[in-house]
């Protein structure tokens, strides 16, 4: 069975124009994948819109994602408890490297901290290195609403990374019905408040 960490690390390299077959996937990269994220700062990409007050509320709809191939999960520590977020490969054919995220109560699912830029492959969002300092590689977590054609996932929020730190979204952990979710605390990209009816595919 192919090591999923090698696959994901390879996709991350490919997303920034590096061929993993040429440079190899180093042990330090794989080790980084095994680390834990403990803070998240978001960025809203210009081609989509963010609904302030929205967040990931997919835990109650976990069955919706059950049929999607699991690639892995990240473990996020907010200082008080751990929230697990799992990434899934979509079935909507928007791009074979487009991944989505949903919260999970399955605590055995742990680390994959890589998120996606639309059709551009996977990129690092943040990890903890051995000295316990954040490593972001210039990428930031962003929230994008699902395209209208994604009726199966209507009302859910997609997570992405983006390289523009000027468009920031601050996330917080909230508890609803005994379950924890990530929620937008502050949206610093006010143009994102204007949610269009249709989201044109970038590029």
UniProtKB/Swiss-Prot annotation:
Activity's dependence on pH: Optimum pH is 6.0-8.0. No activity below pH 3.0 or above pH 11.0.
Keyword Signal belongs to the record: yes
The entry's keywords: Hemagglutinin, Lectin, Signal
Propeptide: 21-53
Gene Ontology molecular function terms on file: carbohydrate binding
Domain of life: Eukaryota
Signal peptide: 1-20
Temperature dependence, free-text field: Thermostable. Activity unaffected after incubation for 30 minutes at 30-70 degrees Celsius. Retains 50% of its maximal activity after incubation at 80 degrees Celsius for 30 minutes.
Keyword Signal appears in the UniProt entry: yes
Functional description taken from the UniProt entry: N-acetyl-D-glucosamine-specific lectin. Specifically agglutinates rabbit erythrocytes.
Record note on quaternary structure: Monomer.
Note from the entry: Divalent cations are required for ligand binding. Calcium is the most effective, but manganese or zinc can also be used to a lesser extent.
Name the UniProt record assigns to this protein: Lectin
Organism: Ulva pertusa (Sea lettuce)
């Amino acid at each position: 069975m192919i090591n999923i960490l090698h696959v994901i690390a390879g996709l991350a390299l490919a997303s920034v124009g590096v061929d993993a077959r040429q440079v190899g996937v180093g042990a330090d990269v794989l080790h980084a994948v095994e680390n834990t994220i403990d803070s998240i700062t978001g960025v809203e990409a210009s081609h989509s819109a963010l609904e302030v007050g929205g967040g990931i509320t997919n835990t109650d709809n976990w069955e919706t994602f059950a049929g999607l191939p699991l690639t892995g999960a990240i473990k996020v520590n907010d200082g008080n408890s751990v929230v697990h977020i799992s990434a899934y490969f979509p079935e909507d054919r928007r791009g074979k490297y487009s991944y989505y995220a949903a919260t999970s109560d399955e605590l055995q699912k742990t680390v994959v901290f890589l998120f996606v830029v639309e059709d551009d492959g996977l990129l690092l969002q943040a990890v903890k290195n051995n000295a316990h300092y954040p490593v972001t590689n210039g990428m930031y977590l962003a929230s994008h609403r699902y395209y209208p054609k994604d009726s199966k996932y209507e009302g859910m929020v997609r997570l992405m990374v983006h390289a523009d730190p000027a468009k920031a979204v601050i996330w917080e952990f909230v508890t609803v019905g005994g379950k924890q979710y990530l929620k937008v605390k502050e949206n610093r990209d006010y143009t994102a408040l204007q949610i269009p009816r249709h989201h044109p595919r970038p590029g």
